[in-house]
Amino acid sequence: MSRGYADRNVRRYQAYTGIGHQAALQQMKDKAPGSRPISTAQGAQRQLEGLVFEHLKGDVAYFAHPLGIASVLPGPGASTVTLDDSMTRHGHPLVAHAIEGLLPAEVPESVRTEGSEHIGVSGIRVARLSRRALHLTLVGTSASVVLRSAGDTDWAALVGERHSDLSGAGYRPCWNEPTLAEQEREFRTDHADYWRATEDASWLPSGLLRRVGLLHEVSSAYCTRYWATWDDWKFELNHDQDVLPAHDALVEHLIDPKWGMELRVDKRHCQCDAVWVDPHYDRECRIELAGPQGRPGTLQLRFRSLGTWRDSSSTHADLLRVQADHRWLHRVMPRHQSPSLSKARGRRRGRPDRSAAQ
């Protein structure tokens, strides 16, 4: 393999996963000849990754990376997900928000309503816990998702605080139980169709999680949100004024036969070049993707472009506050970039000021 080809593969691995150059270089060196660059999770591993991704949503807030995920290191039997060291819009640490959404606990009788009820994700368990990482698994399996933080997060302390808070309020944390708790079993029985549908379609969120870096490295959206209804996933990608959605590039990466997923474009509606669109108002392009015929799971991508009636300066300030990368900000929100700052950076890098040359 030529040096140039190997370097391109390393850069591409970085774009898909968001990990650093040295880590990407090592991952590509360790790949067996002929294997897929990004391995596909199977069985319980795939299901765990799907559940984690579905419930990791970092609230409606702005983070240094889309969805608050800085990087993912995917492996055949385990994945490591690094979260941003950021706060939600309520001033709550993102890592604490993730713990609350993922770790299950039984609800006390005093606050239960009709039907099965518990908080967190049924069946998720803590396999190992340290100051630096939270190792998750599914009950009765060897599946593994390791959560880390880009900051100095004490995972053990946060999980301990969560356990104390819940216990003090009458809840029963069950993330250390070797089997399903009663309320978890009730939930799976009462919602068997839903549980089966999400499990059958878990290939989709698992594959997206393993390629989450594309939302930062390829997409031109400054904000990305998502939600799932059974096996139907929807992503909303918001773009600033005068920034063209990179929907073609993003989809090409997602369906790439070597690096992407088993997805195909099912429907496409684009308003980028529509002459009748009033720039004062928002516009939206939609692309729907599906898996092989008969395979459950659909993905709808909504690329929203803001109209001139919106002022995104406060959003830009929020992204600066959470320490979003300045080069990324310049790409996704260029109109908020300070001209003097751009010139200074160009001089520091030894590049001429292009605006002066024009």
Model-derived features: where do they sit?
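Compositionally biased accessory segments in Actinobacterial proteins
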Residues: 4-12, 16-358
